[in-house]
């Protein structure tokens, strides 16, 4: 009888090769809005070859979702009860869970989408921390965030815009989806469907970028191409559009340029463009149709960096889909770091402003200018003019000007709601000058 030879497990060859490519992309939903969007993506099954993750302070919200990978943020900070709409609590909860986040991302992840609804507590406060952890690990980090509908109120909108500025500093590229822009386009939609449309729009953004990487094309685009465009790209624009029939490529380009994803940004100011053209089997892309693409690209500056590709999608039939990913905008098109004052360029310290307490912010004229800029950028000039109100500024009289009728008239001639700090300062200076003149 032959002796049975048992080989150590380490000497055996494993012929069970993996049948699926390991996912290098994670889509992470932070907070209630981000979690709803990621749950929507997961259930729709629209995005292939990615991993979905939920991060929330609200344990009940995590339990309700069917997304399998979940992290409860700040078990000690919030005890699973949520952030109560306070971003600082969301931030502290995420800081408590940094170790869990690092472990989550230490599996070969190359790219992370951080999705959140700005304006609440967890999404606004925790999403920048989650993004920072990913970016510090060398992962290509893309934020996709929504900002509120106007009917959600001034306080939430301003809180959301502060959150946008905070996460912008912690991602390679940031896509901002303005829910109010969706309302303008789909004006006849009911409230539940309006929020669902916001989830759909966010899904389209993540899906379009992911498929550039995961779907093999004829002129193939891959992670390296997306990385070139998005790495340290700042504010990004992602948009796509479908075209059908005669001049379908031009129609797709037109629809791309009128997508709600553009959020009123001018795509032609970009320095880097990734252009992907996808077509179906019924009517493949013709060489003649590339003339329409050439005409479109001719509208950009000649020094723009362009990466382009083509791919087949059988579901498109005779449609053509154009996807544009654009970055490299000038800082003046993104954040008001400077403004002209008295003929000189003045630097606005937005970073310091963001970190001040709520009460201090509301009393700061620089903060008010900054908020007005952001409201104008995302919601339009008419909105910004009506949404931020200057708080009444008192004029403090002293013994020297209590009986100065000219100063008294200057103060009472301006209603309290029109009294800015600068106006009160000018009156005070005038009073001091008059007092000095009398003393002489």
Task: Describe each PLM feature range.
Residues 1-440:
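Tubulin/FtsZ superfamily GTPase core signature
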């Amino acid at each position: 009888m032959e002796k049975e030879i048992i080989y150590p497990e380490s000497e055996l060859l494993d012929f069970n090769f993996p049948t699926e490519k390991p996912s290098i992309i994670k889509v992470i939903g932070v907070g209630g809005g981000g979690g709803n969007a990621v749950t929507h993506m997961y259930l729709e099954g629209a995005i292939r070859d990615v991993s979905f993750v939920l991060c929330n302070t609200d344990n009940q919200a995590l339990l309700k979702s069917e997304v399998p990978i979940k992290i409860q943020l700040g078990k000690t900070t919030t005890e699973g009860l949520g952030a109560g709409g306070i971003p600082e609590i969301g931030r502290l909860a995420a800081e408590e869970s940094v170790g869990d986040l690092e472990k989550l991302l230490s599996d070969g992840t190359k790219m992370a989408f951080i999705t959140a609804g700005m304006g609440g507590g967890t999404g606004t406060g925790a999403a920048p921390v989650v993004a920072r952890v990913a970016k510090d690990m060398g992962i290509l980090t893309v934020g996709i965030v929504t900002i509120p509908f106007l009917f959600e109120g001034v306080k939430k909108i301003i809180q959301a815009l502060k959150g946008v500025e905070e996460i912008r500093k912690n991602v390679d590229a940031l896509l901002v989806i303005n829910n109010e822009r969706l309302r303008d386009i789909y004006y006849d939609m009911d409230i539940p469907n309006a929020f669902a449309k916001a989830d759909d729009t966010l899904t389209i953004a993540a899906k379009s970028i992911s498929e550039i990487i995961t779907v093999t094309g004829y002129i193939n685009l891959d992670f390296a191409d997306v990385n070139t465009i998005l790495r340290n790209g700042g504010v990004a624009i992602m948009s796509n559009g479908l075209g059908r029939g005669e001049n379908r490529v031009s129609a797709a380009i037109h629809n791309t340029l009128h997508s709600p994803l553009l959020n009123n940004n001018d795509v032609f100011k970009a320095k880097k463009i990734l252009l992907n053209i996808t077509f179906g089997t019924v009517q493949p892309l013709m060489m003649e149709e590339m003339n329409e693409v050439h005409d479109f690209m001719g509208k950009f500056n000649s020094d723009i960096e362009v990466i382009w590709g083509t791919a087949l999608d059988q579901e498109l039939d005779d449609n053509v889909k154009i996807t544009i990913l654009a970055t490299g905008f000038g800082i003046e098109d993104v954040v008001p770091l400077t403004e002209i004052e008295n003929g000189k360029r003045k630097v606005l310290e937005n970073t310091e402003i963001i970190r001040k307490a709520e009460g201090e912010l509301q009393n700061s004229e620089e903060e008010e200018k900054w908020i007005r800029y952001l409201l104008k950028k995302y919601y339009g000039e008419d909105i910004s003019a009506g949404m931020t109100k200057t708080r009444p500024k008192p004029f403090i009289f002293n013994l020297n000007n209590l009986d100065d009728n000219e100063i008294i008239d200057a103060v009472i001639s301006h209603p309290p709601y029109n009294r800015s700090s600068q106006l009160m300062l000018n009156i005070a200076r005038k009073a001091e000058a008059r007092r000095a003149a009398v003393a002489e």
